[in-house]
């Protein structure tokens, strides 16, 4: 039988060890909570900073939406597009040479400048945004005769991404499949059949713009 004193020492030692473990666990838990709270605060501050940084382009999007689409058109469509194109980064460059917030190809921008000599450099945020919205307006006009307004945005942004010729071919594929080629879900349905089209990129692009728009304040 073990003597009482050694037994007491063992029990006390175990109690102290358990208390130390509990204190350590509590300290670790508190540390994790503090770290999580700090991360949340840092993230919120970063989001506020990002919103302030991108909001500086809002007056430009509003100005050229009104100029090229008229009063009543929701300017958020085009900011959402800029977010999808470049995260609203003025100096953005793509691997194929597209430039600026609206990721315009120099050849496309050159055509716009020929028609409108008042446009400045492609890397200037205002002119880049203006040119992107003007290009959207041309696509809007193209689809206007037979595509309902509620569907037309899909066709506009798809044409911007893949080229209007690709979307025309997609519409022909829908017609060949005896589907209504004026509705975007039918274009999505026949997309895999359209040759020379990286359709997954375009379909994702259109979805991303809508999601971006829904996340933006209308002010």
Tell where the protein language model's regions lie, with residue ranges.
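N-terminal targeting leaders of membrane proteins
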Residues: 52-55, 59-63, 67, 80
């Amino acid at each position: 039988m073990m003597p009482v004193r050694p037994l007491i020492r063992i029990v006390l030692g175990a109690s102290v060890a358990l208390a130390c473990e509990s204190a350590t666990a509590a300290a670790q838990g508190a540390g994790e909570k503090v770290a999580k709270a700090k991360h949340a605060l840092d993230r919120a501050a970063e989001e506020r900073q990002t919103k302030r940084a991108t909001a500086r382009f809002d007056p430009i999007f509003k100005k050229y939406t009104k100029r090229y689409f008229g009063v009543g058109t929701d300017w958020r469509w085009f900011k959402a597009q800029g977010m999808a194109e470049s995260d609203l980064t003025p100096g953005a460059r793509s691997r194929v040479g597209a430039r600026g917030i609206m990721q315009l190809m120099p050849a496309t921008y050159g055509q716009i400048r020929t028609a409108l000599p008042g446009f400045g450099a492609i890397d200037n945020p205002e002119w880049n945004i203006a040119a992107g919205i003007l290009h959207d307006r041309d696509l809007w006009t193209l689809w206007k005769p037979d595509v309902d307004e509620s569907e037309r945005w899909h066709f506009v942004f798809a044409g911007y991404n893949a080229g209007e010729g690709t979307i025309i071919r997609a519409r022909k594929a829908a017609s060949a499949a005896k589907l209504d080629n004026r509705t975007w879900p039918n274009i999505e349905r026949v997309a895999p059949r359209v040759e020379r089209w990286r359709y997954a990129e375009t379909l994702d692009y259109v979805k991303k713009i809508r999601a971006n728009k829904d996340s933006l304040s209308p002010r």
